[in-house]
Amino acid sequence: MAAKKVSRKRRVKKNIESGVAHIHSTFNNTIVMITDTHGNALAWSSAGSLGFKGSKKSTPFAAQMAAEAATKVAMEHGLKTVDVTVKGPGSGREAAIRSLQATGLEVTAIRDVTPVPHNGCRPPKRRRV
């Protein structure tokens, strides 16, 4: 019996000049997603998908690597300028923004869209180390 051919979905190259880089930085991981201005995803990466495990995912270096990986894929689509939206309290926020600028994207705006509760859910108890 012949081996089945697995068809891979080929990436269609789009010509998109400007987009939005969404950086979601939690205490445990950093996710970088680059979209066009309408919100359609061009590229994404996270510290966990790059092979960082456990507490290494929450480091600024892991966030930097995630931003570089997403930027490389997005620049293949012709991306040049990007607005940055940052969400979350994690340690990889600034490192990811610096990495976007260092890889050749022009950052036009930085927006913090971290959700702030109007006294909603009770937060988790404080850590005692």
Curated annotation (Swiss-Prot):
Belongs to the universal ribosomal protein uS11 family. The lineage of its organism: Bacteria, Bacillati, Bacillota, Bacilli, Lactobacillales. GO terms for cellular component: ribonucleoprotein complex; ribosome. Part of the 30S ribosomal subunit. Interacts with proteins S7 and S18. Binds to IF-3. PANTHER family: 40S RIBOSOMAL PROTEIN S14/30S RIBOSOMAL PROTEIN S11. The keyword rRNA-binding applies. Located on the platform of the 30S subunit, it bridges several disparate RNA helices of the 16S rRNA. Forms part of the Shine-Dalgarno cleft in the 70S ribosome. GO terms for biological process: translation. Transmembrane segments: none annotated. The gene is rpsK. This is Small ribosomal subunit protein uS11. The keyword Manganese does not apply. Keywords: Ribonucleoprotein, Ribosomal protein, RNA-binding, rRNA-binding. Pfam families: Ribosomal_S11 (PF00411). One of its GO terms (molecular function) is rRNA binding. InterPro entries: Ribosomal_uS11, Ribosomal_uS11_bac-type, Ribosomal_uS11_CS, Ribosomal_uS11_sf.
